[in-house]
């Protein structure tokens, strides 16, 4: 009997411990298929999910990643009403047809219209009566020079010769109508002139510009939202579902626990028709328990994040590559996808995470420095940075994430035990620029492995490397004179 034989049950490997072995390939990087699954019923065009962190994903980030083909998870460090509002902003950002357009009553004022336009970031609003019959439309042009904020909308709206269409008109015909009449908004009405939707020229052009966008069956951008395990979880979920959330992520530090499993079962009883992803976990046993309880997806990663201190504070975790592989083995044949969450520094790590069995990766630090992240902008030593913090940091826990680390009953900040830190990351430009490089690296890796799609990438093989192999993998014996957009030296 020995300690190693009795207590060490597995080797723990992470991304720097291995490299993928190149294989015979008939696949060009530009031809690989990147579509995958986020959850049981939600497909992505690219395997990238932005993290439910208060310095990573709010509406602006969720819109940007969905337009690229991924999905964002809006964090829960805000009121129920505000989180639902963030979801609604994403769902209204882009539509084939807006089925529940923002409207205004004919007796409302100019001030009311301007407030709605500012809240929803829109430039025009259909005007309806109490029965939702269309009586006019008011746009920025109607209000631009109006000084009387108390004037009734029906005094300034366009009410004559309103161009409309019916629900059966196809998008090509809609484009012709908009161009022919030089209008940007086209109300959709039924045979009785009752408003049933709205089509905008902006949405049509967006659809053409971003054909890979991740959208639902109504042409709206997809978005997920995070919840914790608290007394108001179901109330929060109801508000998020009503706002249009496509999936809910039950986000905790330890998903393989009684309280989380019971909350999952309760949530599935109340919301059987919406996908619920649960995390975080690090073992196949945990994955089986969550799937048995009804999970539509699982999130893998305990402690690998750049701002996470769980492994050193609690002494707990599984190196990320091994965790992903162990969960992937357990999920084989279930149809339930896994999200590899954390530990990613380069695009090559993304390829490794997917090759180990991931269907998508959750990214935090890689995108926290982008224009679309909600983190504060910081100037330090003449360089631009953005704030980035773990949801287990003291600052985030004070703002609402205590329940993620099972400390919701602690009111004294001095008695909180953080499992994360607050930091800063270099400003990186737009999300599009970052995703472009990550996707490019993923395509290259799949080409080297001869993998035409992510399912085939799961068959790729690894070689274990030494510390010398890691050093050899990075630029060495030179001074970098021109930085690449997809590489910086590890700190």
Language model regions located:
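Active-site-adjacent beta->alpha loops and helix N-cap segments on the catalytic face
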Residues: 30, 79-88, 146-150, 194-214, ...
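Catalytic beta/alpha-barrel core
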Residues: 73-77, 103-104, 124-126, 164-165, ...
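Alpha/beta catalytic cores of nucleotide-metabolism and tRNA/nucleoside-modifying enzymes
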Residues: 1-24, 104-105, 166, 226, ...
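Short beta->alpha transition motifs characteristic of CBS
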Residues: 74-79, 122, 126, 133-149, ...
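Catalytic cores of alpha/beta
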Residues: 60-63, 235-243, 282-300, 340, ...
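Bateman/CBS regulatory modules and CBS-like beta-alpha motifs in cytosolic regions of diverse proteins
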Residues: 30-44, 51-53, 82-120, 127-129, ...
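Glycine-rich phosphate-binding active-site loops on the catalytic face of alpha/beta enzymes
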Residues: 67-82, 245-257, 296-314, 344-378
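Short beta-strand/loop segments at the ligand-binding rim of alpha/beta enzyme cores
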Residues: 43-50, 96-101, 216-226, 267-282, ...
């Amino acid at each position: 009997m020995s300690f190693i034989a009795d207590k060490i049950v597995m080797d723990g490997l992470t991304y720097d411990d291995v490299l993928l072995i190149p294989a015979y390939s008939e696949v060009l990087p530009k031809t690989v298929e990147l579509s995958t699954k986020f959850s049981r019923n939600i497909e992505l065009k690219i395997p990238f999910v932005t993290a439910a962190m208060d310095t990573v994903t709010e509406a602006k980030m969720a819109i940007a990643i969905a337009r690229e083909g991924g999905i964002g998870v809006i964090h829960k460090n805000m009121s129920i009403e505000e989180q639902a509002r963030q979801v609604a902003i994403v769902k209204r950002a882009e539509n084939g047809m807006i089925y529940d357009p923002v409207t205004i009553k004919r007796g409302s004022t100019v001030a009311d219209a301007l407030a709605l336009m500012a809240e929803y970031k829109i430039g025009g609003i259909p005007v309806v009566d109490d029965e939702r019959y269309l009586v006019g439309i008011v746009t920025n042009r109607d209000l631009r020079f109006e000084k009387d904020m108390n004037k009734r909308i029906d005094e300034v709206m366009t009410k004559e010769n309103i161009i409309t269409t019916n629900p059966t008109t196809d998008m090509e015909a809609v484009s012709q109508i908009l161009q022919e009449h030089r209008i940007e908004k086209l109300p959709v009405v039924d045979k009785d002139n009752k408003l049933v939707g709205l089509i905008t020229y902006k949405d049509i052009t967006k659809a053409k510009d971003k054909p890979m966008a991740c959208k639902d069956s109504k042409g709206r951008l997809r978005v997920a939202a995070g919840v914790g395990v608290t007394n108001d979880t179901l109330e929060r979920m109801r508000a998020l579902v009503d706002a249009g959330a496509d999936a809910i992520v039950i986000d905790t530090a330890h998903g393989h626990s009684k309280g989380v499993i019971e909350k999952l079962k309760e949530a599935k009883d109340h919301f059987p028709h919406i996908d619920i992803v649960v995390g975080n976990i690090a073992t196949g046993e945990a994955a089986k328990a969550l799937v048995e309880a009804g999970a539509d997806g699982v999130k893998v990663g305990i402690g690998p994040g750049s701002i996470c201190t769980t492994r050193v504070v609690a002494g707990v975790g599984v190196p990320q590559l091994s965790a992903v592989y162990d969960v992937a083995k357990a999920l084989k044949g279930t149809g339930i996808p896994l999200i590899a969450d954390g530990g990613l520094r380069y695009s090559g790590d993304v390829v490794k995470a997917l090759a180990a069995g991931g269907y998508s990766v959750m990214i935090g630090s890689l995108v926290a420095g982008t224009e679309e992240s909600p983190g504060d902008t910081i100037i330090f030593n003449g360089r631009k940075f953005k704030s980035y913090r773990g949801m287990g940091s003291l600052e985030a826990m004070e703002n609402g994430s205590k329940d993620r680390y099972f400390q919701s009953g602690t009111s004294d900040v001095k008695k909180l035990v953080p499992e994360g830190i607050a930091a800063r990351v270099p400003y990186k430009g737009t999300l599009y620029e970052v995703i472009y490089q990550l996707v490019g690296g993923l395509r290259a890796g799949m080409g080297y492995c001869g993998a035409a799609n992510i399912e085939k990438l799961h068959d790729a093989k690894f070689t274990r490397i030494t510390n010398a192999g890691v050093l050899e993998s990075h630029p060495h014996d030179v001074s970098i004179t021109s930085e690449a957009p997809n590489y910086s030296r590890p700190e």
